[in-house]
Amino acid sequence: NLRAIPNQDGTNSGVFVVLSLDRGLVIIGGTHYAGEIKKAIFTIMNHILPAKGLLPMHCSANTDGANSALFFGLSGTGKTTLSADPERALVGDDEHGWSDEGVFNFEGGCYAKLINLSKKDEPAIFATTMMRGTILENVVLNADGTPDFTNDSLTQNTRGSYPIESIENRTSNSMAGNPKNVVFLTCDCLLYTSDAADETGR
């Protein structure tokens, strides 16, 4: 378990992500959150793609074929849940690009937050947790080997990583037209809304 030594390495903790754009190098240590890998690559893409006329976005996306929608928000605000709408085709759940032709998914997979996941409220995501190819990250298992999605003893940030093909209702090429709806999710888990969310200043 490689960890930084804060006093020696100039970090705030034992966890570190070191990124060199010149070398195309990322070194990650001291964390059990695999999301740091994808976020490091996304950071590099944010540096490279705008110069090529592409906008990298931390959002989920879906479409009904005619109308595409983007959902922006911090972790845990509902991007993955909202994009897995049974009435709309999933483009992707977390990282996308926007070009003149439309939006497209970078990843080819999903990275869903699983804490308090229920079959009733999120059936498509719940189904992926039982599929071949899914990786459950930091999810505590019951004595019989089944996952306990309510257990946050390791972390609230439990995750499921699964191929986008695990979602039945998806676009065939992880692409969609230019979005007509852009949604900014501003509530936290207690449904408190940020002051910055009110454009009127009230």
Question: Locations of the language-model features?
Answer:
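Glycine-rich phosphate-binding loop used to anchor ATP phosphates in small-molecule kinases
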Residues: 139-187
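Conserved nucleotide-sensing/catalytic segment adjacent to the nucleotide-binding pocket
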Residues: 99-150
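Single conserved hydrophobic/aromatic residue that forms the stacking wall/gate
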Residues: 192-201
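N-terminal pre-Walker A segment at the start of P-loop NTPase domains
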Residues: 38-56
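Phosphate-binding P-loop
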Residues: 53-55, 59-66
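Long, basic/Gly/Ser/Thr-rich N-terminal segments
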Residues: 1-26
